Amino acid sequence: MKPIIAIVGRPNVGKSTLFNRLVGRRKAMVDDMPGVTRDRNYAEVNRFDVPFILVDTGGFEPETSDRLLQQMREQSRFAMDEADLILFIMDARGGLTPADRDVVDMLRRINKPVFYIINKVDGEKQEAEAGDFYSLGVDHIHTISAEHNRGVGDLMDEVLAAIPYDREKELDEEITRIAVVGRPNVGKSTLVNRLLGYERVVANPTAGTTRDAVDTRFTVNKKPYLLIDTAGIRRKGKTVQKVEKYSVMDALRSIERADVVLIVLNAEEGVTEQDSKIAGYAYEAGRGCIFVVNKWDTLAKDNSSIAKFTEEIRRNFKYLPFAPILFVSAETGQRTGKIIAEVDQVMEQYCKRVTTGELNRVFTQAVDENHAPLSAGRRVKFYFATQVAVKPPSFVVFTNCPEGIHFSYERYIMNRFREAFGFNGTPLKLIFRGRDKKDA
């Protein structure tokens, strides 16, 4: 297991700026609005051939009456429990605060390496003004400017020397990547917390509480997974704040990174146009898909309720007839235990390979039973089919008329492949290609 380094500190001291500086890309949102980084945000970093997991936390306020800040504080404490090494960030411009002193007192009681860092020290003037921080009585204080990369290299040299790492124990493991997507406040964060068994993501009734896409590694029956809890995707007209625009892009990037996408729907509201757009993103990206109908426990139901909602999904998502549907309650845990098992089944189909012999037996039978329509008066001939890729399963069909295959016939061939080989939960890619003369 890679060592874990947690970045903690009060809101708006520059934790996310340092996080992004070390990660080398804009993974955590950076904005002047206090509390922008609300959850623990994970990233894998490899610096000078030393790999580690970096954790960016929400702001740490030791004493606060604000509910969201209280939740962020608990997340920071959880991150410190997980971490092998802690970077505690303070703000040179804001000066030393009583809250800083309280956190330092708490960190002294933790039996882990702690680096005390004063951020926003852009030059000698700020260096001189940072003298108050030395009254904390800690062994060593590092002064940096994360924004301007001042002192960061020297800091990390010392950090890398201090973190525990055993290269022999580091495994190159295959991991199933799961993205959780949906409109704001359909219950994604509650679902993530239910799957993981603890409060990993701040779940709050306010729509849009989860702003960053937050990655979490976990294992089930010794099998590794990476869970990506995306920020809710809003309709374009409602994406007013700059920070919310970041979240939409982050959610789309999360879909691109995933193998399997959990499309979370709100049972109370039914299927909306925005749900269709979100599912369309996953389909167009060629990802395995599972519909998760959340808040199912809140509905008054009869014996036909599941059938009716299933029909509504199939009617609105005609391009995803292969996606399994699960009806769950993240709040109570009802049926959530089935999700990972379903992910495993979809992942198996997403990676499935079919031999050329088996494929052409099914393909030839399908063509014999239903010939392709003429193309501009020309008879369409097929030669053979072969699988060329997985994730998703992709096939090339060689023909004399690659431009003349109607989409309905393409759908017919894919349906026959599904009947024969399954491919439940995964899209298929079918490419028609002309045969080279040398192959004729």
Swiss-Prot record:
A Gene Ontology BP annotation from the UniProt entry: ribosome biogenesis
Residues that bind GTP 1: 9-16, 56-60, 119-122
Sorted UniProt keywords: GTP-binding, Nucleotide-binding, Repeat, Ribosome biogenesis
Pfam family, one: MMR_HSR1
GO molecular function: GTP binding; ribosome binding
Record-stated family: Belongs to the TRAFAC class TrmE-Era-EngA-EngB-Septin-like GTPase superfamily. EngA (Der) GTPase family.
Subunit structure: Associates with the 50S ribosomal subunit.
Protein name in the entry: GTPase Der
Phylogenetic placement of the source organism: Bacteria, Pseudomonadati, Thermodesulfobacteriota, Desulfuromonadia, Geobacterales
Annotated gene: der
